[in-house]
Amino acid sequence: MNERTSDAFDALLVLSFGGPEGHEEVRPFLENVTHGRGIPPERLDEVAVHYHHFGGISPINALNREIIANVEKELASRDHKLPVYFGNRNWKPFDNEAAEQMADDGVKNALVLATSAWGGYSGCRQYQEDIQGMIKHLESQGQSITFTKLRQFYDHPRFVSTMAQLVQDSYAKLPDELRDEARLVFTAHSIPLTADNAAGTPEDGSLYSTQVKEASALIAEAVGVSDFDVVWQSRSGSPHTPWLEPDIVDHAVELNEKGQKALVVCPVGFISDHMEVIWDLDSELMEEAEKRNMVVERVATVGPTDEFAALVVDLIEEAELKRVIERLGKLPARGSSVNGAPCGDGCCGTAKHKTARVNPNARSAAPAAN
């Protein structure tokens, strides 16, 4: 079943990855993330060190609560009486617990916002699997909710225009003598090439990486930049497995060796400044740039903005059939389905494309993907 319901929705669930909020939560969180994937305990120990460096706290839950508060405000401003719930795949508040609370509150027909703009297994299909898991959990409790996932929004006009403004804000922070020559670089989470090849339906062809590239082109056009780069970050797994390249730090080094003195780095693939952004970009990239006397301005993420909250409510109104779907891109923007149904036959391959995202950076045991 893949049909959209009209305006009978009675709740919104913000569904995310999850992250620890204290030292004692780090190890069990990492064990949840990597359950059944054969990650050695010593590898988890290495990753845990970086969480403890930040007080054992991933910023993702606080950032999602900020998004929820903004969405609630926007819903109220448009006279939507829609309660907002929060659930995570890997840590508290867990998605099954959120689903139970929703059912106890009488919710019957809920919308789901996954905190990802993209297609592909990790960006979309895995959230559909989470929805299937919540449905099974509710059935075991004698309860039921119909869940409708909101679509991928990588090319929504508000996403593009807000990211463009944030890029312009970063250019404005550069020294006058470097502003005109600064190179614009977009970055998103790397995934194995096999997973990217399987992203979307078979006819889509590498939907994840092509969506990232199209979004980057749309943002650059809005900024007025014609020459830019799209690179990747936070890879994990065996170094022998091909992933999307080049890596952001490697790319920055290469540009610097060719004489580039300034970069504007836009983490287009990330909704919020979660652990991968503050570790891979604000720590590793900045440290390398400082060694080379290279100026890097990292663009803010879209999640905390009022415009992102407005985007979310636009998607809700689209699902309610009260608003025309607004898109700037030409690629498929899938992801909207009922009760975790795939977007189409063969969508995002199979479970063999799952990736354990414990170490988002090949150089060191960086924090998990949250």
Swiss-Prot record:
Main EC class the enzyme belongs to: lyase
Pathway assigned to this chain's UniProt record: Porphyrin-containing compound metabolism; protoheme biosynthesis
Reactions the enzyme catalyzes: Fe-coproporphyrin III + 2 H(+) = coproporphyrin III + Fe(2+)
Residues that, per the record, bind Fe(2+): 189, 276
Binding residues annotated for Fe-coproporphyrin III, in chain numbering: 58, 127
Location (main, coarse): cytoplasm
PANTHER family: FERROCHELATASE, FERROCHELATASE, MITOCHONDRIAL
HAMAP family hit by this protein: Ferrochelatase
Role according to the record: Involved in coproporphyrin-dependent heme b biosynthesis. Catalyzes the insertion of ferrous iron into coproporphyrin III to form Fe-coproporphyrin III.
Name of the protein described by the UniProt record: Coproporphyrin III ferrochelatase
Origin species: Corynebacterium glutamicum (strain ATCC 13032 / DSM 20300 / JCM 1318 / BCRC 11384 / CCUG 27702 / LMG 3730 / NBRC 12168 / NCIMB 10025 / NRRL B-2784 / 534)
